[in-house]
């Protein structure tokens, strides 16, 4: 059995979370200390797998794998080996023109020290000047292959291309030309990952609210537990979850300043229903709230509308074995020019009776 995630990936920086969040996680049975042993930090080292780059023939003239990521993106995967090549070797192996390879090395050896800016003005400068201006004007980069590599090096760190990043943002995410660094501090390694991602948290929440839905005393025990969906909406439950029911309108039952109840309208099986509640928590994508709650204060509605999400596509692929990944040394492969811009092994987490793949002869899950 292979388990992976299809939505929210991991619990990010829990040690910086508020006490309310930490208390909630403890209350639903999430043991944060358990992840220090559940996550196999030595997996990638044992199998010689690190950050690499795959260049395709369509864009770069040849299909080529280079043992260097050219950016910091893969560094968020805990335990992943770094690039095997020096900057000089990596630039020499890139399928670029002679001029392009020279410019690539200039970028890889660049950084804030390349800016002719006084120390006192540096922070203002890097926050107000663009990363691509730095590449093109400060470093003199005009090779299209190098610029394409830079454009993809920021990947999913913002809701915009690296072309629109400030120098400060590019430095923060480790875009091409800024030295690899720890994306998360040592107190917050990126290891807080259930095999099914944060669905593990959601399942633990449901179990806390509706005890009869599954067997298991804590979140780890629920990893392989089967949920009895018939328990979710029983009339006798203190809490009932109704699936396939889309809320289309929420409003106060009267003047918002004095109303004692809220009215919720939802659609189920193409029929409209309305329920009343003393309180309603809008636990959804916040930008949708102004469209659902008609009597919000305008200032609050405007603030909620200002939020953005970036188009973001993950593809999960099951493989019969992962010899190709191991033999090529691929833990994470950056792929500038491909529709999928990165390919990576799933996180090596074993818990709750679930065992992550250990042998390349066995099936595995990769993310793209």
Predicted regions and their residues:
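Active-site rim elements
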Residues: 4-15, 117-124, 187-196, 300-308
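N-terminal glycine-rich phosphate/pyrophosphate-binding loop and immediately adjacent elements
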Residues: 1-113, 119-120
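Conserved beta-strand->loop/alpha-helix structural units within folded catalytic cores of enzymes
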Residues: 17-18, 33-36, 128-131, 138-140, ...
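Short, solvent-exposed loop/turn and secondary-structure capping segments
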Residues: 22-24, 65, 148-149, 162-164, ...
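A generic secondary-structure signal for well-formed alpha-helical elements
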Residues: 25-33, 112, 138-143, 209-216, ...
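C-terminal segments that line or cap access tunnels to active or ligand-binding sites in enzymes
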Residues: 186-193, 251, 260-279, 284-368
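Active-site/ligand-binding neighborhood in enzyme catalytic cores
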Residues: 95-245, 253-260
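Residues that flank catalytic or metal-binding motifs in active/ligand-binding sites
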Residues: 7, 48-49, 237, 243-246, ...
């Amino acid at each position: 059995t292979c388990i992976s995630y299809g939505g929210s990936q991991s619990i990010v920086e829990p040690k910086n979370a508020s006490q309310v969040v930490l208390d909630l996680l403890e209350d639903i049975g999430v043991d944060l200390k358990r992840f220090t042993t559940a996550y196999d930090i030595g997996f990638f080292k044992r199998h010689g797998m690190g950050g690499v780059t795959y260049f395709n023939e369509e864009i770069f003239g040849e299909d080529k794998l280079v043992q260097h990521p050219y950016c910091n993106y893969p560094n968020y995967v805990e335990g992943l080996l770094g690039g095997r090549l020096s900057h000089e070797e990596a630039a020499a192996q890139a399928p670029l023109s002679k001029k392009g390879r020279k410019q690539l090395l200039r970028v890889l050896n660049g950084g804030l020290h390349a800016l002719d800016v006084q120390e006192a003005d540096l922070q203002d400068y890097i926050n107000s000047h663009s990363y691509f201006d730095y590449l093109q004007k400060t470093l003199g980069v005009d090779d299209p292959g190098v610029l394409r590599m830079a454009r993809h090096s920021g990947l999913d760190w913002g809701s915009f291309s690296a072309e629109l990043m400030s120098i400060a943002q590019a430095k923060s995410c480790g875009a091409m030309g800024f030295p690899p660094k720890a994306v998360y501090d040592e107190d917050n390694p990126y290891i807080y990952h259930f095999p099914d991602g944060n669905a593990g948290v959601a399942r633990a929440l449901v179990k806390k609210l509706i005890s009869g839905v599954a067997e298991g005393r804590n979140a780890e025990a629920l990893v392989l537990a089967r949920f009895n969906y018939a328990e979710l909406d029983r009339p006798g439950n203190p809490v009932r979850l109704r699936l396939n029911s889309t809320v289309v309108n929420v409003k106060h039952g009267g003047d918002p300043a004095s109303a004692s109840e809220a009215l919720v309208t939802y659609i189920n099986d193409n029929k409209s229903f309305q329920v009343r509640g003393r309180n309603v928590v809008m636990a959804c994508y916040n930008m949708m709230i102004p469209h659902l709650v008609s009597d919000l204060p305008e200032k609050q509605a405007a603030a909620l509308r200002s939020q953005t999400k970036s188009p973001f596509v993950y593809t999960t692929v099951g493989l019969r074995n992962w010899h190709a990944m191991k033999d090529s040394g691929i833990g994470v492969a950056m792929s500038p020019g491909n529709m999928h811009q990165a390919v990576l092994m799933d996180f090596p987490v074993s818990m709750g009776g679930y065992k992550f793949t250990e042998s390349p002869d066995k099936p595995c899950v990769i993310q793209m």
